[in-house]
Curated annotation (Swiss-Prot):
Family: Belongs to the IalB family.
InterPro entries: IalB_sf (IPR038696), Invasion_prot_B (IPR010642)
Signal sequence, start to end: 1-23
Domain of life: Bacteria
Name of the protein in question: Invasion protein B homolog BAB1_0368
Keywords: Signal
């Protein structure tokens, strides 16, 4: 069985090539850090004088134990949050996906590429949406299965989102 944590870390620090680096160091001079904030995990890597941090939530199928969704986000300037959703194969990529923060419409997503682990959909939240994420309950993701063509829904819990985001902001100052 594949080690999805290792795949996730490799994905974090290679697939997100636009990941901003900040002149900061991790507590105790550590080169890596991983902390959990309810349903979110903060992962950081420090090299020389730069530290890169992301927050991640992975969801697995209760029946098979296989990963079905990974949300990976990072803070950017201006109170914005950028990232990517890694979703399973078998989706109608041309139709993309739509997001709602609880019941409020969020950004529509376009799939950018597929990797051996699944298909990527970049996501960006503006400062107003980030405030809604911090006070919200779920990100509701809706997309369409390819065959048979039917809606597929995912819920990304926002428990711990605010604390995880605050932590990566503090670690990358």
């Amino acid at each position: 069985m594949k080690n999805y944590r290792a795949i996730g870390l490799a994905f974090t620090f290679t697939a997100l090539s636009s990941l901003s680096a900040f002149a900061a160091s991790l507590p105790g001079g550590a080169s890596t850090l991983q902390e959990t904030y309810q349903d979110w995990t903060v992962s950081c890597q420090s090299q020389k004088d730069t530290t890169a941090c992301v927050m991640r939530q992975e969801q697995s199928s209760a029946q098979t134990g296989q990963r079905v969704l990974t949300a990976e986000l990072r803070n950017v300037a201006g109170g914005k949050v950028d990232g990517v959703l890694l979703m399973p194969f078998g989706l109608d990529l041309a139709k993309g996906a739509s997001l709602k923060i609880d019941d409020t419409a969020g950004p529509n997503l376009t799939f950018s590429t597929c990797l051996p682990q699944g298909c990527l959909a970049p996501v960006s939240f503006d400062a107003k949406q980030v405030a809604a994420l911090k006070s919200g309950t779920n990100i509701n993701v809706t997309t369409t299965a390819l065959s048979p063509s039917q809606p597929v829904a995912f819920k990304i819990s926002l428990k711990g989102f605010g604390a995880a985001l605050d932590r990566i902001q503090a670690l990358t100052k």
